[in-house]
């Protein structure tokens, strides 16, 4: 047995203490000389400055080899040729490599589990593992890579029992929760599976077994993280990769130093020895403390092994459960895949006949398990059946929730589309439709479809398949959608009414402004004295027309809103918005009327009616004797008085602006930001916009008024000059003696023309044509065409004569012309080469 180690029951020598001491032997006896060993290794006087590490794992997995290479100890290792147990009981030795590690590290080598020497007697391995867990700061779990994910191979079954008893014996009555570190060292790691994946698998397994253990009453909700931290490391194969193994072991050794937690992510900073792991037992009292722990473990009856009957029942029930779950998977997995695909695409998909399929698959699985497993241990059977039903129900619950979510989403979309379609159909038909009736009908239809789907998913005896809360939630959302659709329809109604208001105002306001152009006396407008109603009361009439139009629009809106079952608050908000938008429409129409071109035209018409027509409305024919200047001055000044009148929206009766804030009213309660975002600010009402009521009522600014006066005066001056020229032009006449002389000297010619019918008719036609051409301003173009035709004819004649002389030998000799080298064709005279006077243009001028 371990050479140079002090065994239980013998008085050790210094040489035997050299490599450690056997704390507990294979017969479960505690060694009372542990304190002597601590004194001889100078650990007893270290106080709290020491650390205890234990190793845990299956037999012959290299636990002792790991400790020897890591801490420089000399625990006995297995002979490869014999493959038998080497470590018996629990041995302890002090770390020999303190250069890169913390001081006073005590290492306990625990007998391996699942050894053939003890066979089915697992009592000692459980108790030794529990002792190591209860006393050590760090418990190294030594496993091979291929054991990760196994239940027995990874010692998960043993850890489950150890966790449960440790919780009951040592933690249930303590106010604080002592923590330990489970340090998993994964041996023979080849790297195909990343360490992070192995870590996730182990953490999931540990969490699962922790959730399944029996906990004391005060610790039902305790989590494994409340008592344990986890660390992980991987080592290569010692035989196949010896150099890499040594390097990784050295790197692993650097982690066994003091450390602390990060304040941000609670990860280790420094080493693995955290202060909360220490049991706070002085080193000189550790031996007594450990002996008490071992005594409590040995004498505890809760550590007895379960009966073989229970083990058999557990094995068979697990096996049967896997078989029935396979059949359950065949029915449910395709449905889960379809639902997942629809969720990935973002499209709601209601699985057909999900309720019947799920009920059938679940009932078949439960019945098959009952038939095969009910003959085994009743307690185990009942527990395993509950586990089986829990697994199936958890999957069905997720599937059902996805189904109802899809039905919910599809139902809401269908409801919205149906209501919108019915409203559009009513609008296209031109008839009236009741929005509230449409909503109520479609809502009942949609709720019936959802209720039918939810009832189809119900499974008898399972309370969680009662989906009344989901139904109420669906109904609530339909109400919200109904409210939103009603609000949208109210907005559309308001838009239609606003368009009607704009149309009415456009005609009515335009008519009132057109009256400004009717200033002639025949219309009843005197040139002096009080202004007629068509001018002085302009704004009164506009305000009266505006109020009447908006009142009618409000009645239309309120009457139509009743069919929507809109609340009085919603109607009041709609009327308030309508009044605001109507005023903005009026201002826009007024601004359009007083645009520079429009208002100047109306002022000119007003002036001309007063200037060109007399008191009876008869057009004036100006004579040099008329008082043109006086009439012009009175008409101009009368028209100029309209500009101040138009510059401000002011009632003649009160000589003040209308009470716009009172007419629009205060903002009703319940107005949301969406109701205000499309509203134009109004001066005197929206004070935060910085525009006063006086500015709101100003139609023409001072600069525009002055500019309008200047432009109008120029226009009026032009009319005056035209009238003056017309009066003076009538004074230019042909003398009478000229006509007498013309008639006397031309009598013979006149009589000749009259007596000759041909000349007389030609004279009439020429005179008539000349008169028409003169009135149509065609005399100039006709003269140009005649001149062009004459010039063209002259050019063509010259060209033809030249060709004749060139081609005729006799004529050429008579004129002594030289023979021509040009072809007979010559240069052609074309109409498109003539200028406006009929002259031939040079080709260079045409750019050819």
Curated annotation (Swiss-Prot):
PROSITE patterns: G_GB1_RHD3. Residues 829-848 have a biased composition (Basic and acidic residues). Residues 815-848 are annotated as: Disordered. InterPro entries: G_GB1_RHD3_dom (IPR030386), P-loop_NTPase (IPR027417), RHD3/Sey1 (IPR008803), Sey1/RHD3-like_3HB (IPR046758). Pfam families: RHD3_GTPase (PF05879), Sey1_3HB (PF20428). GO terms for molecular function: GTP binding; GTPase activity. Gene3D superfamilies: P-loop containing nucleotide triphosphate hydrolases (3.40.50.300). Keywords: Endoplasmic reticulum, GTP-binding, Hydrolase, Membrane, Nucleotide-binding, Transmembrane, Transmembrane helix. Residues 47-277 form the GB1/RHD3-type G domain. Residues 755-757 are lumenal. Its EC number is 3.6.5.-. It is an enzyme of class 3 (hydrolase). The chain crosses the membrane at residues 734-754, 758-778. GO terms for cellular component: endoplasmic reticulum membrane. It is a multi-pass membrane protein. GTP binds at residues 57-64. Residues 1-733, 779-848 are cytoplasmic. GO terms for biological process: endoplasmic reticulum membrane fusion. It is found in: Endoplasmic reticulum membrane. Cooperates with the reticulon proteins and tubule-shaping DP1 family proteins to generate and maintain the structure of the tubular endoplasmic reticulum network. Has GTPase activity, which is required for its function in ER organization. Belongs to the TRAFAC class dynamin-like GTPase superfamily. GB1/RHD3 GTPase family. RHD3 subfamily. This is Protein SEY1. It comes from Pyricularia oryzae (strain 70-15 / ATCC MYA-4617 / FGSC 8958). The gene is SEY1.
């Amino acid at each position: 047995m371990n050479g140079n180690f002090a065994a239980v029951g013998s008085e050790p020598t210094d040489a035997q203490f050299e490599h450690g001491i056997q704390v507990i032997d294979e017969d479960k006896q505690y060694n009372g000389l542990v304190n002597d060993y601590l004194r001889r290794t100078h650990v007893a006087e270290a106080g709290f400055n020491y650390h205890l590490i234990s190793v845990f794992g299956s037999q012959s997995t290299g636990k002792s080899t790991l400790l020897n290479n890591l801490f420089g100890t000399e625990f006995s290792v297995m002979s490869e040729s014999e493959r038998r147990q080497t470590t018996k009981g629990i041995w302890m030795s002090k770390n020999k490599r303190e250069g890169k590690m913390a001081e006073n590290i005590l290492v306990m080598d625990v007998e391996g589990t699942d050894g053939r020497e003890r066979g089915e007697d697992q009592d000692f391995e459980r108790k030794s593992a529990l002792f190591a867990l209860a006393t050590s700061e760090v418990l190294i779990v030594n496993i091979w890579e291929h054991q990760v994910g196994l239940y027995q191979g990874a010692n998960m079954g043993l850890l489950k029992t150890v966790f449960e008893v440790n919780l009951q014996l040592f933690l249930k009555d303590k106010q604080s929760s002592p923590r330990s570190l489970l340090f998993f060292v994964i041996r023979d790691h080849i790297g195909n599976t990343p360490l992070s994946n192995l870590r996730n698998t182990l953490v999931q397994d540990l969490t699962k077994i922790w959730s399944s253990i029996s906990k004391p009453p005060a610790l039902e909700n305790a989590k494994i993280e409340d008592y344990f931290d986890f660390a992980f490391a991987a080592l290569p194969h010692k035989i196949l990769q010896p150099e890499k193994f040594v390097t990784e072991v050295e790197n692993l050794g650097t982690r066994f130093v003091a450390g602390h937690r990060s304040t941000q992510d609670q990860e280790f900073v420094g080493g693995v020895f955290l202060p909360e792991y220490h049991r706070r037992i002085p080193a000189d009292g550790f031996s007594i403390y450990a002996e008490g722990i071992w005594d409590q473990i040995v004498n505890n009856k809760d550590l007895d092994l379960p009966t073989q009957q229970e083990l058999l029942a557990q094995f068979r029930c697990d096996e049967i459960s896997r078989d029935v779950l396979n059949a359950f998977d065949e029915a449910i997995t395709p449905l889960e895949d379809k639902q997942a695909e629809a969720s990935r695409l973002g499209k709601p998909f209601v699985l057909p006949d999900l309720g019947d399929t799920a009920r059938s698959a679940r009932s078949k699985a439960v019945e098959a398990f009952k038939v095969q497993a009910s003959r085994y241990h009743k307690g185990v059977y009942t527990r395993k059946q509950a586990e089986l039903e829990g697994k199936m129900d958890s999957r069905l619950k997720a599937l059902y929730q996805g189904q109802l979510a899809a039905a919910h989403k599809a139902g809401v979309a269908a409801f919205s589309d149906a209501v919108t379609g019915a409203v559009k159909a009513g609008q296209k038909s031109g008839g009236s439709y009741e929005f509230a009736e449409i909503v109520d009908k479609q809502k009942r239809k949609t709720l019936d479809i959802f209720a039918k789907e939810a009832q189809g998913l119900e499974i008898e005896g399972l309370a969680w398949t009662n989906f009344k809360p989901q139904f109420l939630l669906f109904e609530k959302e339909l109400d919200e959608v109904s409210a939103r659709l009603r609000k949208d329809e109210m907005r559309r109604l308001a838009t239609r009414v606003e368009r009607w208001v704009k149309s009415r105002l456009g005609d009515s306001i335009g008519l009132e402004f057109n009256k400004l152009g009717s200033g002639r006396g025949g219309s009843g407008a005197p040139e002096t004295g009080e202004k007629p109603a068509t001018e002085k009361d302009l704004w009164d009439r506009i305000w009266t027309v505006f109020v009447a139009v908006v009142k009618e629009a409000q009645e239309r809106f309120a009457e139509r809103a009743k069919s929507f079952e809109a609340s009085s608050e919603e109607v009041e908000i709609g009327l308030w918005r309508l009044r605001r938008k109507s005023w903005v429409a009026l201002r826009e129409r007024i601004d359009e009327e007083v645009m520079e071109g429009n208002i100047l035209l109306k002022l000119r018409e007003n002036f001309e009616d007063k200037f060109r027509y007399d008191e009876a409305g008869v057009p004036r024919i100006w004579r040099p004797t008329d008082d043109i200047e006086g009439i012009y001055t009175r008409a101009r000044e009368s028209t100029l008085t309209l500009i101040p009148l138009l510059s401000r929206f002011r009632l003649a009766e009160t000589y003040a602006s209308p009470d716009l804030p009172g007419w629009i009213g205060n903002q009703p309660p319940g107005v949301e930001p969406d109701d205000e975002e499309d509203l134009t600010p109004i001066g005197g009402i929206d004070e935060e916009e910085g525009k006063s009521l006086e500015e709101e009522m100003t139609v023409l600014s001072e600069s525009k008024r002055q500019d309008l006066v200047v432009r109008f005066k120029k226009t009026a001056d032009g009319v005056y000059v035209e009238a003056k020229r017309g009066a003076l032009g009538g004074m230019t006449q042909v003398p009478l003696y000229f006509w007498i002389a013309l008639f006397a000297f031309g009598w013979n010619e006149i009589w000749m023309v009259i007596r000759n019918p041909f000349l007389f008719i030609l004279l009439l036609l020429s005179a008539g044509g000349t008169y028409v051409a003169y009135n149509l301003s065609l005399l100039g173009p006709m003269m140009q065409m005649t001149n062009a035709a004459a010039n063209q004819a002259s050019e063509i004649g010259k060209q033809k004569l030249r060709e004749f002389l060139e081609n005729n030998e006799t004529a050429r000799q008579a004129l002594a012309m030289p023979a021509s080298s040009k072809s007979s064709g010559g240069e052609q005279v074309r109409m498109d080469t003539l200028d406006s006077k009929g002259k031939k243009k040079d080709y260079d001028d045409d750019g050819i």
